[in-house]
Amino acid sequence: MTEFDLSTREGRWKHFGSVDPIEGTKPTIKEEMKDLQSTHKNFLFEIEEVGIKNLVYPVLVDRFQTAGNFSFSTSLNLDEKGINMSRILESVEKHYHNGIELDFDALYQLLRSLQERMNQNAAGLDVSAKWFFDRFSPITQIKAVGHADVTYGLAIDKQNVTRKEITIEAAVTTLCPCSKEISEYSAHNQRGIVTVKAYINKDIELIDNYKDVILDAMEANASSILYPILKRPDEKSVTERAYENPRFVEDLIRLIAADLVDFDWLDGFDIECRNEESIHQHDAFAKLKYRK
């Protein structure tokens, strides 16, 4: 058995099974290597989307830096074997300035760079991140950081935007109207998870505070908002407000829809509420879709 010098890293590696590299015969210089992706011939079908998923990169959502989870794709012509996926990361890095800014204008410019770098007509992305914001307790007005989940979706074909959407998911309190109605006192309540996918009108200038407007529709129509910090006066207020505003999942999504339906910057929306029922072993949910 070969003895290795265990006082060195290389010796320990070989002791645990590492071996020396072989003398290879294939090129090691990029220009001499075969580029399979760039092969051109009839590959039978065009591909609508090909790319990468689960790319985690720093992003800026308003004034907070957080982690974004990206998927990127481009189209692929019938006569091309594949895309050069490393160029996707090169395009991302070109737009990285202490975090990729999550707004539609910045993401559009990123897609245009990707489109040009990949030499393809169509490109798209989806990116999810935590959205942090200041939240004040209802009575004592103590500030803390609240959060919701946001997902931006954007796609282009040449210079034209073909898909523009934002999804916001936030937790709220819902108090059961039936429980309140049949009980002598109190009512069961629970955390509800509300998701709104908003389809943005591509032909109208988008208002600056669109995220806040959508989140307000989601939270204000619930039995109560969730707060990071509650002192006793706040807790009293939250408890009583929930009792005064009972909501089924059906009620909540209809009320949210009523708030959103007349905005000209929206082409439509999907709304879902899922209640983590406090007196059942199952969840309750409701969904609706609306298109103009």
UniProtKB/Swiss-Prot annotation:
HAMAP family: GTP_cyclohydrol_B. It catalyses: GTP + H2O = 7,8-dihydroneopterin 3'-triphosphate + formate + H(+). Belongs to the GTP cyclohydrolase IV family. It holds the Pfam family GCHY-1. One of its GO terms (biological process) is tetrahydrofolate biosynthetic process. Pathway: Cofactor biosynthesis; 7,8-dihydroneopterin triphosphate biosynthesis; 7,8-dihydroneopterin triphosphate from GTP: step 1/1. Disulfide bonds: none annotated. The record marks 176 as: May be catalytically important. Converts GTP to 7,8-dihydroneopterin triphosphate. It is an enzyme of class 3 (hydrolase). Its EC number is 3.5.4.16. This is GTP cyclohydrolase FolE2. One of its GO terms (molecular function) is GTP cyclohydrolase I activity. Keywords: Hydrolase. NCBIfam families: PRK13674.1-1.
